[in-house]
């Protein structure tokens, strides 16, 4: 029993380092119900919702600086004010926040009503604009007329979406896409709707035969360079020569929480090219639906593994690199917690991030992923009861937890330029070809190279040479000054060369050779990818300017070679060079070795990505 407690203690101690707990400051939002949270760079906007304390719908907006956890309320400009709403959707597009649908409240009649209008907030001008909706069949009271109006384009009436709340949503290119949701009677709406953000018009409406809503499902956009596309898109996808792909997304659905059912749907949107679309629009003036089509595939079987996520309420889905991140509220009689699961494309497994002691207590709900820093952000309150807030659908913003995903091997791979086989072969030829200078290693060995390649592929090399020239100039002037004051005033020309054909790099021959191979070829071959050499290259990157991309590439390679034999070397190097995510992952591996080296099987209740 004492050994088990020791292992849990070690595991929790590493969680302390992979998670940062912060207290929100300044103008923190009150507890809210049904608000929207939108990421914007290093900030997050919180808009609308219902005040959990007095049940009033609000149209306030708050923004938090995620570097300082400082909140402030946004002051609007202009006369246009947004409509108070909750359980609406919020998306970011071109420095604008797009809010659709949700539920409104009439203070006079004390009635709720569903919406299908759009409010747009311009982040730069701090002004609002409004796009009215239209009365639809599922709006049964007159309150909606005050908001939605009736002045709409007769030709596009049939394309207006049904009013709804709790729907799914995303932005692909310049299109806002709305999926499903529920009406005022809580019936599911089986629709897909597309709004053209450029023209300000609804352009598509179609049946979507799924019961989707934020309580048990969510969606995420797939980047066009993601390996998930190769995994899910069929090889024999038939695409008309007159159409092009707008983008793709995943739907994750889970339901029947006693005996959980899961479904993953791949959806790709195609649009007719402009010339062809205009022809069809002329022939079918009333039916813009002809301009779009969806490819829908059930890819659930591709995401099956020995361990599977439990049923999650209000799931959130994100993609970071080759990882699909699923988070949400897990409720059973024995455990109530906010949990994170990751589908690793490399391992082809669902794995739970080990977060014992951090999100296992308190009330946590709204979340987002910071791609650039590989961090998962969760808003909540560490002292409240999750079950109580879940029953109220209440969100809190008093505390913020930052989880270093890279410490679990979940991160976005560095964006390296695409290196073709031909360009790599050319680089190798040049590496063994002509040269006009040399790299001098710590062993006093010389490696010939071409200065033009260094200038072109390593922009900071120019600064290094300029500083060398400046030093030579200063040394020359110092020597001249010793010969007498009459020589000091002579108009000597500036020195434009270092006078040397060698650049000293205080690293081994193997490390310098690997560095030059990267400069010439844009990649490293297997012989250079030993842990010791990669650690030396990481230190080299910190010692010279302009090697940030190479630094990220080496960190990625070190993640790939990390094992029990080199973990301490990698930990020390990562700590020395400031590679925090790699350092944390190595620390977690060291802690696991200290536990006795026993691996947790994939079917364990708490597997992790280092197994």
From Swiss-Prot:
Q: Which UniProt keywords apply?
A: Kelch repeat, Phosphoprotein, Repeat
Task: Identify the InterPro entries for this entry.
Answer: Kelch-typ_b-propeller (IPR015915), SKP1/BTB/POZ_sf (IPR011333)
Note the SS bond partners.
none
Is-annotated flag, keyword Repeat?
A: yes
Pinpoint the residue ranges of every Kelch repeat in the record.
Answer: 43-91, 96-149, 175-224
Q: Which GO terms describe its molecular function?
A: peroxidase activity
Matching SUPFAM superfamilies, A to Z? Kelch motif (SSF117281)
List the GO biological process terms.
Answer: cell redox homeostasis; regulation of conjugation with cellular fusion; signal transduction involved in positive regulation of conjugation with cellular fusion
Say yes or no: keyword Secreted present.
no
Residues modified as Phosphoserine are: 604
Q: Which GO CC annotations does the UniProt entry carry?
A: cytosol; endoplasmic reticulum
What does the UniProt function comment say about this protein?
Answer: Essential for mating and for recognition of the mating pheromone, and for the determination of cell shape. Implicated in activation of the ras1 protein.
Please state what the protein is called. Protein ral2
Q: Which gene encodes it?
A: ral2
């Amino acid at each position: 029993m004492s050994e088990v407690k020791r292992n849990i203690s070690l595991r929790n101690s590493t969680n302390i380092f992979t998670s940062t707990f912060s207290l929100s400051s300044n103008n923190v939002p009150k507890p809210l119900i049904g608000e929207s949270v939108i990421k914007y760079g290093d900030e997050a906007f919180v808009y609308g919702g219902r005040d959990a304390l007095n049940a009033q719908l609000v149209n306030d907006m708050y923004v938090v600086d995620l570097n300082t956890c400082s909140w402030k309320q946004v002051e609007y400009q202009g006369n246009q004010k947004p409509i108070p709403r909750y359980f609406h959707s919020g998306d970011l597009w071109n420095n604008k926040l797009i809010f659709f649908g949700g539920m409104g409240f009439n203070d006079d009649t004390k009635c709720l009503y569903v919406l299908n209008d759009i409010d747009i907030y311009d982040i730069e001008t701090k002004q609002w604009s409004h796009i009215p909706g239209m009365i639809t069949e599922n709006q049964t009271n007159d309150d909606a007329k005050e908001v939605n109006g009736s002045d709409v384009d007769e030709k596009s009436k049939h394309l207006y979406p049904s009013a709804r709340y709790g729907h799914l949503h995303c932005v692909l290119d310049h299109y806002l896409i709305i999926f499903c949701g529920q009406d005022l009677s809580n019936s599911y709406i089986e629709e897909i709707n597309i709004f053209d953000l450029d023209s300000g018009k609804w352009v598509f409406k179609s049946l979507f035969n799924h019961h989707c809503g934020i309580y048990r499902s969510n969606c995420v956009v797939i980047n066009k360079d993601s390996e998930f596309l190769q995994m899910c898109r069929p090889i024999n996808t038939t695409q008309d020569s007159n159409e092009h792909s707008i983008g793709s997304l995943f739907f994750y659905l889970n339901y029947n929480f006693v005996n959980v059912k899961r479904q993953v749907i791949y959806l790709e949107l195609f649009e007719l090219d402009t010339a062809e679309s205009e022809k069809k629009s002329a022939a079918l003036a009333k039916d813009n639906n002809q301009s779009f089509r969806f490819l829908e595939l059930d890819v659930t079987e591709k995401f099956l593994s020995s361990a599977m996520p439990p049923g999650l309420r209000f799931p959130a889905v994100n993609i970071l690199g080759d990882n699909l991140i699923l988070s949400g509220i897990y409720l059973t009689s024995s455990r109530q917690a906010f949990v994170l699961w990751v589908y690793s494309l490399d391992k082809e497994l669902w794995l739970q991030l080990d977060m014992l002691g951090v999100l296992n207590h308190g009330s946590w709900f709204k979340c987002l992923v910071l791609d650039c820093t590989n961090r998962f952000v969760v808003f909540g309150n560490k002292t409240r009861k999750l079950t109580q807030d879940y029953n109220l659908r209440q969100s809190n913003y008093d505390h913020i937890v930052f989880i270093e995903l890279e410490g679990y091997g979940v991160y976005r791979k560095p964006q390296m330029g695409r290196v073709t086989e031909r360009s790599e072969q050319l680089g190798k030829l040049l590496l063994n070809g002509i040269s006009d200078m040399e790299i001098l290693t710590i062993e006093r060995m010389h490696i010939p190279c071409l200065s033009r390649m260094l200038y072109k592929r390593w922009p900071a090399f120019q600064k290094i040479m300029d500083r060398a020239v400046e030093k030579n100039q200063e040394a020359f002037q110092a020597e001249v000054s010793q010969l007498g004051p009459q020589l000091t005033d002579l108009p000597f020309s500036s020195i434009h060369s270092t006078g040397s054909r060698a650049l000293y790099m205080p690293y081994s021959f193997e490390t310098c050779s690997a560095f030059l191979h990267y400069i010439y070829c844009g990649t490293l071959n297997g012989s250079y990818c030993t842990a010791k050499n990669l650690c030396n290259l990481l230190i080299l990157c910190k010692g010279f300017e302009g090697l940030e991309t190479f630094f990220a590439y080496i960190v990625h390679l070190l993640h790939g070679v990390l094992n029990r034999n080199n973990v301490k070397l990698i930990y020390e190097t990562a700590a020395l060079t400031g590679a925090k995510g790699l350092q944390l992952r190595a620390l977690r591996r060291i802690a696991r070795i200290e536990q006795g080296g026993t691996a947790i099987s994939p079917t364990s209740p708490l597997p992790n990505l280092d197994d």
